[in-house]
């Protein structure tokens, strides 16, 4: 029986989709990212919450961007700063690289945090 506060997953979390560009080689042999038909990876039971840009807060100004954060209990293989994310039907840009939370004293892996942003309006 799982404890009601089981921290191995977020049982009431949401489903999000990681979007990664397809990569093609052009006529010159260079790799080119193609966002026309991105590769989609689905993640379930993700915690999502609104967050703020630290840069804007430090400067004391409002941002032109809306910021959210996602917490994953499972590994997020392939996620990086170039990914886009579909959350509640809206596409967001990654805001930096994923952050893996690992407790230095106990070795507990708390999960992965991914910050995203999108232009307001």
Segments and roles (model prediction):
Residues 12, 20-121:
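Short, conserved turn/kink motifs that form compact alpha/beta structural patches or helix kinks used as
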């Amino acid at each position: 029986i799982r404890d009601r506060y089981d921290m191995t997953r977020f049982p009431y979390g949401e489903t999000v989709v990681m979007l990664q560009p397809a990569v093609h080689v052009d006529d010159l042999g260079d790799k080119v990212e193609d966002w026309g038909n991105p590769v989609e990876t689905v993640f379930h039971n993700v915690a999502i919450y609104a967050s703020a840009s630290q840069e804007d807060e430090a400067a004391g100004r409002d941002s032109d961007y809306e910021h959210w954060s996602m917490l994953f209990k499972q590994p997020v293989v392939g996620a990086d700063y170039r990914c886009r994310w579909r959350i509640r039907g809206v596409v967001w840009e990654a805001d930096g690289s994923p952050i893996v939370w690992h407790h230095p004293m106990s070795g507990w892996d708390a999960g992965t945090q991914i910050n995203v942003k999108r232009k307001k309006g």
